Amino acid sequence: MKLIGYFRSSAAFRVRIALNLKGIAVEHASRHLRKGEHRAPDYVAINPQKLVPAFVLDDGEVLTQSMAILEYLEETHPEPPLLPNDPVGRARVRSLALIPTADIHPIQNLRVMAYLREKYEQSEEGTFAWSRHWIETGFEAYEASIAGNRHTGAYSHGDQPTMADLCLVPQVFNAARFKVDMSKFPTIQRIHTTCMKHPAFDAAQPSRQPDAEP
């Protein structure tokens, strides 16, 4: 199996964490998003969405969209689980995971930033302000959902990492890039610190990837 990603991609970061947690060894390849390598014809033939990650199975089948890949890994490699056993718990974890992946990331990723610059002549500070607004809006919802909740433990749900944490941590890394004041989100900060002490999260972070840049 092969994961095609980019060191700074939040979506690829989620999948790397899952692979590490489940002990799944795969080949890693990179497409440099800022250089437009994800739009090259050979990659578009693999993933017409022109996004990373793409997850190539041993039989040549290609999976796209990080959440679909996470669900595939959970179904094919159930241990350790990324979802709780109970229906309510699974729904809560998926709901939390969708805050970063559906409410935040799609409106502040690289292609949105590029569109704001090119179409609306936004400066870097303008695009950063846009990103900060949407990250903070999403984090306000995430923080309110986990702070004081009886299901919250060392991690977003209970005392083991779940799919929610795999989606939260990459977004916290993005928040640092866009200079978000994280002091407003103490529970998120605590959980992020806990996650980054886990070898699976630490090894998946952008700076530890072969294609990492300053």
Pin down the residues of each PLM region.
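Conserved beta-strand edge residues that scaffold enzyme active sites
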Residues: 33-34, 189, 209
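Phosphate-coordinating loops and pocket residues in cytosolic domains that bind phosphorylated ligands
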Residues: 45, 197, 206
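GST-like fold's C-terminal all-alpha helical module
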Residues: 100, 104-197
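GST-like domain detector, emphasizing the conserved glutathione-binding G-site
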Residues: 1-126
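Generic structural signal for helix capping and beta-alpha/helix-loop junctions
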Residues: 13, 36, 192, 212-213
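Juxtamembrane membrane-interface segments at transmembrane alpha-helix termini
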Residues: 200-201
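Carbohydrate-binding/catalytic loop surfaces
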Residues: 162, 209-214
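Active-site-flanking alpha-helical
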Residues: 74, 171-172, 205
